[in-house]
Regions:
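Ferredoxin-reductase
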Residues: 1-41
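FNR/FR-type flavoprotein reductase catalytic core
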Residues: 33-154
Length: 154
């Protein structure tokens, strides 16, 4: 972030090649992410390295085979960040995926519009019941399975 910053792992949630920008999602928990929270539109990091790690295994699979599968993604809180680019990639390749995203409250739910735009079915969950399914994401998975949904990839 600056000359005194540390290297921390962050998920690249989205990008805009034309604008030369990336979108990252984080929760302020330490010194670096707390500093990052103070940045405004147009601010920048002194240094950014990435992407690091491995791509989703889904990118290695045959698209036509993926289209035959019933795929479910489940994430909660900032765990929605790594779900979105995978679901978006599938959507761009004509593959539907269902998505369950949870948070403590409606106000803490992230990437909702983005998920709705690329999901086959989108199921928001809130622990406090303020929006969508009341309860944990795991109870939504159970409910879908009890209703007869079968998933090949989860």
């Amino acid at each position: 972030m600056d000359e005194k910053g540390e290297r921390i792992p962050l998920t690249i949630c989205d990008y805009d090649r034309e604008a030369g920008t990336i979108t990252i999602v984080f929760q302020p928990v330490g010194a670096s992410t707390t500093k990052m929270k103070e940045l405004k539109a147009g601010d920048y990091f002194r240094d950014f390295t990435g992407p690091l790690g491995n791509a989703s295994e889904l990118v290695e699979e045959d698209i036509e085979e993926l289209k035959k599968k019933k795929i479910l993604f489940v994430g909660g809180g900032v765990g929605a960040a790594p779900v979105y680019p995978q679901v978006k990639w599938l959507h761009e390749h004509g593959v539907d995926a269902d998505v369950i995203i949870g948070s403590k409250t409606k106000d803490m739910l992230i990437l909702e519009k983005e998920m709705e735009a690329v999901s086959g079915n989108y199921y928001p969950c809130t622990d406090d019941g303020s929006y969508g399914h009341a309860g944990m994401v795991t109870t939504m998975v159970e409910e879908l399975v009890e209703k007869g949904n079968k998933y090949d990839v989860c």
